[in-house]
Amino acid sequence: MARFSPQDLADHLKDGLLSFPATAFQDDLEVDEVAYVEHIEWQSSYPVAGLFAAGGTGEGFSLTVEENHRVTQLAVQASSPEVPVLGSATGSTKSAIANAQGAEAAGAEGVLLLPPYLTECDAEGLYNHAAAVCESTSLGVIVYNRANAIYSPEVIARLSERYPNFIGFKDGTGNIEHLAKITTLCGDRLFYLGGLPTAETFALPLLQMGMSTYSSAMFNFIPDFALSFYADVRAQDSAAVKQKLSDFVLPYLDIRDRAQGYGVSIVKGGLKAVGRNAGGVRPPLRNLSEQDIADLSDLLATSGAGSYRLPVEVKA
């Protein structure tokens, strides 16, 4: 039974940092439930506003429907009571509905609707896809605007008018004109979150567009640094943001961009670099090379991001 109504969930999520926990795998690439539970317990010990299980960073695209449900269930059970867990819905409409209903059965508070896999969609098709998911669950639904799932402003407005449990718009395109049209049409009926890869890079300018939060992949392995960065963004401390970008985030991007798919792989490389192993990634992704991990370890050390600690009163 969800503790948050859809609107209460939106109000909660928009005022804090969000993250997508990596899904731990064993050497045979089966889900490592023990390591995953430990990871969720560690992540939820920080003042993060919400954790999205089986999302992009959690390799939800590589999980079966059954694994998606189990991973979400484990996250709900392991998370601190103060930190809501949301599920992720992906694939075909039928699969996305199964994911959403599985998340609700697991006790999740909401669901993120990811783009359908490898299919072209027009506006009406995307409306029907999102509408079917909204109708299938009482949980709050957030759509992810990215890749082949570019929701027109008119579709977002229709969804927000028709479905009270449609609560959020996550953008992974960075199209400012598109975002401006949506925020103008929908206003504070929805909450808006940044979903570009390594979202810290864009967080400060997007704050001016009404995006008060974003999904932080690096929270997986340097949560103190990620929360400090978010605090600087919300305070609009441009000097502090630029310093952190220069010291860590931009060099981190250089490592991430060495190979396609490293946006997910580097998170597990980061966990390994800080002594927390969530295993490798499933194909078709590939793991960071040993040199990549060594370079990331050096960057974490020289930038101070790996040893950064929040003041106790902030972390409590």
Curated annotation (Swiss-Prot):
Pfam families: DHDPS. It is an enzyme of class 4 (lyase). SMART domains: DHDPS. GO terms for biological process: D-glucarate catabolic process. It comes from the Bacteria. GO terms for molecular function: 4-hydroxy-tetrahydrodipicolinate synthase activity; 5-dehydro-4-deoxyglucarate dehydratase activity. Pathway: Carbohydrate acid metabolism; D-glucarate degradation; 2,5-dioxopentanoate from D-glucarate: step 2/2. It catalyses: 5-dehydro-4-deoxy-D-glucarate + H(+) = 2,5-dioxopentanoate + CO2 + H2O. The keyword Repressor does not apply. Keywords: Lyase. Its EC number is 4.2.1.41. PANTHER family: 5-DEHYDRO-4-DEOXYGLUCARATE DEHYDRATASE 2-RELATED, DIHYDRODIPICOLINATE SYNTHASE. NCBIfam families: PRK03620.1. Belongs to the DapA family. HAMAP family: KDGDH (MF_00694). This is Probable 5-dehydro-4-deoxyglucarate dehydratase.
